[in-house]
């Protein structure tokens, strides 16, 4: 029966299906579990069947980034009002930041790749899903009235802040992930209170820390330091 099923499954293969299975495998077992052979087994096909959709392991890893940004873009489309955000460019950047955070929460094992893999190739060779989000952000800023230099400054600041916050949040190593006591989970009980009184005093704060609220609050502070574009009302009015 398995031999009869395999050709049928091969016929249903597609790049989105292959990348979706790769994302699911990495979510469950980590990046170290991802091999062409293991992914083929997950899909019920021979390894060679995958090479039509991805030429090898490195390309497959890049495909994880592609799928990650596809998900961000899908989240943004699902929550789109169909035009300019009624509250302006800042509100749209906050909406993008939330979509980025939700995707990072869903796929924390892929997040470090998002911070490094796109930078390893020239801009024009990055996945279309990465370029689509970049274009959207730059278009938001352009419609708001930022000139080219201002748009790039805000874009780079926005991306750096989001990635930095999410990497600290999602990739923090803890002593015991299942431990409910934050002092024990983070290993802070090992620190002498006399030497590190402030760290020890902040232990209760770690228990109810809202990372997304901190990220958005910090983003607002960064954007407050940006000069308002001269055509800000243009974006608010939808360009009319």
Per-segment meaning from a language model:
Residues 119-145, 149-156, 168, 188-197:
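Amphipathic alpha-helical packing segments from all-alpha helical-bundle domains
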Residues 17-24, 28-29, 59-78, 91, ...:
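Alpha-helical structural segments
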């Amino acid at each position: 029966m398995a031999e009869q099923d395999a050709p049928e499954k091969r016929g249903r293969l597609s790049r989105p299906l292959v990348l979706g299975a790769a994302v699911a495998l990495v979510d469950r077992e980590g990046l170290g579990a991802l091999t062409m052979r293991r992914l083929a087994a997950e899909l019920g096909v021979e390894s060679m069947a995958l090479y039509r959709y991805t030429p090898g392991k490195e390309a497959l890893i890049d495909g994880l980034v592609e799928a990650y940004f596809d998900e961000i873009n899908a989240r943004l489309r699902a929550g789109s009002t169909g035009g300019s955000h009624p509250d302006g460019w800042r509100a749209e950047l906050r909406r993008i930041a939330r979509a980025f955070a939700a995707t990072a929460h869903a796929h924390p094992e892929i997040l470090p790749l998002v911070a490094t893999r796109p930078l390893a190739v020239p801009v024009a060779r990055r996945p279309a899903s990465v370029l689509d989000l970049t274009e959207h952000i730059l278009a938001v800023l352009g419609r708001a009235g930022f000139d080219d230099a201002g748009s790039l400054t805000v874009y780079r600041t926005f991306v750096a802040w989001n990635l930095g916050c999410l990497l600290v949040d999602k990739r923090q190593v803890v002593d015991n992930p299942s431990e409910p006591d934050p002092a024990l989970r983070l290993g802070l009980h090992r620190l002498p209170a006399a030497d590190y009184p402030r760290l020890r005093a902040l232990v209760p704060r770690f228990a109810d820390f809202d990372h997304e609220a901190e990220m958005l609050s910090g983003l607002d502070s960064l954007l407050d330091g940006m000069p308002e574009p001269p055509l800000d009302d243009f974006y608010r009015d939808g360009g009319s």
